[in-house]
Amino acid sequence: EFAPGDLMLITDHINLIVMGGLSPLRGQNIDSLGPRFPDMMNAYDDVLRDIAVRISNDLDFELRQGVYASLAGPNFETPADLRFLKVIGVDAVGMSTVPEVIVARHAGIRVLGVSGISNKANLDGNTPTSHDEVIEAGRVIVPKLVNMIRGVLYNI
């Protein structure tokens, strides 16, 4: 239901990178930076999300909401990857964001997660994703994202 050029407010994530053993918190913990096992139950701050929704309404664009999955990349997903992600409840997928969220939450930093939808999932494998398509969607996404983030920053 999402389209290239949409912005999606991340309400939760599925961390497939860390499930594969690549946690940004591996190694010895520095207690002064945060707890060994940070709580990820509310990784994305409700207050910041509410502000983002209000700002996007003020700016007259639809801010989608959904669950983000993080994969290691750097490659686009296979049709089987995409079908699996759909079954487990993923709305958008990317190669970043989640490791940064984990580190931020480890440090006690509030997080607002927003994902730019750059291409449509091709579940049947008939239409390959092109890098040019992703770049073009970015041109649509950037002005909306910049204006929304400015609005959020002015309201916190």
How would you name each of these model-derived features?
Residues 1-125, 131-156:
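Glycine-rich phosphate- or other oxyanion-binding loops that anchor nucleotides, phosphorylated ligands
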